[in-house]
Amino acid sequence: MKVKPEGSPGLYVHVPFCRSRCTYCDFHVAALRPGVVTDYVSALILEIQHHADAGFSPETIFIGGGTPSALSVEDWTRLLKCLSESFQSGLKEWTIEANPESIDEQKIEIALSLGVDRLSTGAQTFVETGLALLGRRHDAQRVHEVHDLFQKLGVPRTSLDLIVGWPGQAIDSVNTDLAAVKEIDPDHISLYHLSYEQGTWLHSMRERGGLKPIMDDTCIELSRAFLQGLQEQGFERYEVSNLYARGGASLHNLNYWERGEYLGVGSGAASFMEGLRWKNKPDVQKYISAGGSPEKVSIETPELLEVVTELIMLELRLTRGMNLNRFKTETGLDFHEICGESL
């Protein structure tokens, strides 16, 4: 598969399985059934090998879900070994999402031995009432234990996912989370605002009056306090929802925000290559049956107006602002000529 010379192709690997669905989650996920999971990993390996044989060579790998760390040790090893053997040349970053309740010392050691250099933990909050409301399966202490393991085993780069704006959250909850971040000392933080997506438990409860979201003004105040506290700890904000203290930005996600090329493998995974956008059909059983050649759906070539809109929307998420040279290269247009009067 041909990739633009100036592109920074990323590989996203989707592992859709979860023991239970979090109350805010609207991602493509499936129940964790051992036989199905093993068959899925086998199909995933076939798809990965197909792209490797075709010449695809990513600069970054990101394994997300779902819950990648919920894989058995055998399936975890098979998947990571396939990726390690397929994509060694030119790889700059390899991240795996890990949930605190399902990652352990053995899986971490296997990942490090095969080339993984970045682990991202879905903590969301260190307040037990918040964890229960969000449907998380771990407690706050487990996140501390996992990051102690990361330090013990020498994980090169670590990241922590947190959520701000959950019902009932107040400034003391933010301070609890900030104190935990200071103690854990991760290299990177992703701080997301809670959203009530249609089809989720939280959305349903809000519509039925079963819970009361916090007011927008309160959410903004909490977010500002959170960001200020992180910056006082030495974190530098480089994107709307992301900060780092050491180790730099997430290269894989930075590629998304720069509208770079990426290939998605697995059920429901999205791709953007050579100006074409598509995703694999989000159906685990059909993905398994396809044997490494999944059906592509939602295939489209963005029109110029969509390209312009995407570039502006994505790059304005970055604190550095827009790259006007990139804008002209991608669109053939001069940004100042088309937008100057509006600035």
Feature annotation, model-predicted:
Residues 333-343:
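Short amphipathic alpha-helical interaction segments
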Residues 3-10, 29-51, 57-333:
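C-terminal scaffold of the Radical SAM
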Residues 14-29:
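Local cysteine-cluster metal-coordination motifs and their immediate loop/turn environment
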